Structure formats: C-alpha cells, structure tokens
Amino acid sequence: MAFLWLLSCWALLGTTFGCGVPAIHPVLSGLSRIVNGEDAVPGSWPWQVSLQDKTGFHFCGGSLISEDWVVTAAHCGVRTSDVVVAGEFDQGSDEENIQVLKIAKVFKNPKFSILTVNNDITLLKLATPARFSQTVSAVCLPSADDDFPAGTLCATTGWGKTKYNANKTPDKLQQAALPLLSNAECKKSWGRRITDVMICAGASGVSSCMGDSGGPLVCQKDGAWTLVGIVSWGSRTCSTTTPAVYARVAKLIPWVQKILAAN
C-alpha cells in the first residue's frame, strides 16, 4: 500500500561554500533505516534540515538550496509557524551549534495532488538567511535536462523511523546508499501510480521511512552532490525490497526557477 513518509504527531548559492561539496566528507557503506541505514558522519550532509513544529517535533526533512531557500515535499504541509533547523546531527543533543530559522513564506507547487502525489514539492523562503559554515551549506540543483540513469548509486538521509513500527525516530541523522531505478522497473511494483515527475530508488535492502519525507535523494555529478529526488512515498511497512518513490527534481526545476526569480 502506498504511504506518505511524513511523521504526524499522531503516529543562488553562497560564494564561500560551493553547492554540493560538504566541508566534512560523508562516509557511505556500499550498502549502508532510514531502514538498514547507518549513522551519518556529523555535519557531512550540510544541506539536510529538520522541519519542526512549534513543540520541537520533527515531522519532515528538507534541503537547503541557498542561504534563503529550502526545498521539501508538498505533502509535509509546512506552515509559517513551523521552523527549519539547520546544522543538526543529533536531535537528542543540546551541545550542537544549530540554527533555528523562521519561515517567511511557503510556496507549494500548485499542481501538487494528494491523491496522485504528483508534483510533491514545496519551497520555503526563510525569514532570515542561514549562515553557511562547515556544517551548513547548499546542495546543487540539477538542470531540467540532467539525466541520472538507472543503476546510479545515490544517497538518502533523514531522521525517519528505522523500523516502520518503531515508537520513535532516531536521534542521529541516518544515511543509506541506494541505486536509482528506471520508471519501467518501478512500475513493476507500483503500476500506473508512477509518473514522469517521480523517480524511484532502493529495493536494495534499504528504504526511506516515516519522518524522512521531504528530505534529499542526492547523486554525484561532476564531483558535487545534486538533488535528484525529494522523499515522497512508498511502502507502508518501509519494505527494503520495494522501491521508494521520490519527486523527480529535474522535472520540477522550471517551477523552482520561476518561484526563485519572482521572490
């Protein structure tokens, strides 16, 4: 059964820091919850943010694409009363140099449909810019014609559940390496629900899960990590043999560019 991977309470870039090149290098196992993932190296995914409500509850992930903008999933339902937390690794620690950033404006893709989960992207304009540092910087955006072929090994990160029936999410940021799938291959699991604005990955022993929604699926291009997908939906039990489905960022770039240019 298809399932959106947000957590509900009830269950253009910096000159000093180029995009997609972390100051602290990530270390990924070839097969690294996320289901069957592993703790990330602290600070090694500097664009990863946590979206939290006013009680401090983490409900979705997101990615910094500049000092002023975060990209996440439309189905996360972010509001301006929520906050973006940047520079975080361990959500159980009070020792980290985090940035808690207010949201000025929420731009949900007007073509988003909760029924089909097509166009699952929202842009967040920050009220005050993030301060880029060793542990806070932007991911690169793909161009509209970028092609990331099936079989490409990519990475996804998040504080989502490490088992679908876990009572709580992990404190430490999780990561997993996983291959991209062709949409034809993905349709073997999900049928006509898979559209050209989606990209699939996984079915390789790892999976995104509840609480990872909105976070990044990144692949390396010319030595820089590029945002290929946004965690969107998948198996209700976060099955590691079923592909996870992500919003296909390259297809959504024209809309992103339009919003950034107008704001």
UniProtKB/Swiss-Prot annotation:
Which cystines does this chain contain? C19-C140, C60-C76, C154-C219, C186-C200, C209-C238
Q: Per its UniProt record, what InterPro entries does this chain match?
A: Peptidase_S1_PA, Peptidase_S1_PA_chymotrypsin, Peptidase_S1A, Trypsin_dom, TRYPSIN_HIS, TRYPSIN_SER
| UniProt catalytic activity | Preferential cleavage: Tyr-|-Xaa, Trp-|-Xaa, Phe-|-Xaa, Leu-|-Xaa
Q: Which UniProt keywords apply?
A: Digestion, Disulfide bond, Hydrolase, Protease, Secreted, Serine protease, Signal, Zymogen
This protein is called Chymotrypsinogen B2
This protein's GO cellular component annotations are: extracellular region
Start and end of every Peptidase S1 domain?
34-261
The record ties this protein, via CDD domains, to: Tryp_SPc (cd00190)
- EC number(s)? 3.4.21.1
From which residue to which does the signal peptide run?
1-18
Organism encoding this protein: Homo sapiens
Origin, by domain of life? Eukaryota
Q: According to its UniProt record, what is one Pfam family this protein matches?
A: Trypsin
**Member of which family?**
Belongs to the peptidase S1 family.
Q: Which GO terms describe its biological process?
A: digestion; proteolysis
User: Which molecular-function annotations from GO does this UniProt entry contain?
Assistant: serine-type endopeptidase activity
The protein's enzyme class: hydrolase
- Where is this chain's protein located in or outside the cell? Secreted, Extracellular space
- List the catalytic residues: H75, D120, S213
